[in-house]
């Protein structure tokens, strides 16, 4: 299962943020985290964008 996880680059995240603004960036990141992609900031995004804190079970980031 870990082979399905892809780390998003800062450029990928920044591109979405500047092109779509905060709401689009939040929903895009939520979708990517839920699909197994992880920028290393999924916990931050859940708490910052949606006010929800998820437990990652270890590595400091959230994987669905």
Swiss-Prot record:
Q: Which domain of life is it from?
A: Bacteria
Q: How is it modified after translation?
A: Contains 2 disulfide bonds.
> What does the UniProt keyword field contain?
Antibiotic, Antimicrobial, Bacteriocin, Disulfide bond, Secreted, Signal, Thioether bond
How is the activity affected by temperature? Answer: Thermostable, activity is retained after incubation at 90 degrees Celsius for 15 minutes.
Q: Cross-link named Lanthionine (Ser-Cys), where?
A: 61-64
Q: How does activity depend on pH?
A: Stable from pH 5.5-8.5.
GO biological process entries: defense response to Gram-positive bacterium; killing of cells of another organism
Q: Where is the signal peptide?
A: 1-21
Using the record for this protein, list the coiled-coil segments as residue ranges, or answer none: none
> Would you name any one GO CC term?
extracellular region
* Location of the protein in the cell: Secreted
Q: What does this protein do?
A: Bacteriocin with a narrow antibacterial spectrum. Antibacterial activity against the Gram-positive bacteria L.plantarun, L.pentosus, L.curvatus, L.lindneri, L.mesenteroides and E.faecilis. Lacks antibacterial activity against the Gram-positive bacteria L.brevis, L.sakei, L.lactis, P.acidilactici, B.subtilis, B.cereus, L.monocytogenes and S.aureus, and against the Gram-negative bacteria E.coli and S.typhimurium.
Q: Which NCBIfam families match?
A: glycocin_F_RiPP (NF033417)
Q: What is this protein called?
A: Bacteriocin plantaricin ASM1
Source organism of this protein record: Lactiplantibacillus plantarum
Tell me the gene name. Answer: bactA1
């Amino acid at each position: 299962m870990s082979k399905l996880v892809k780390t998003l680059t800062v450029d990928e995240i920044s591109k979405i943020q500047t092109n779509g603004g905060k709401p689009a960036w939040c929903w895009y990141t939520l979708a990517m985290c839920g699909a197994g992609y992880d920028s290393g900031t999924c916990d931050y995004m859940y708490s910052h964008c949606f006010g929800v804190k998820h437990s990652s079970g270890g590595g400091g980031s959230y994987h669905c």
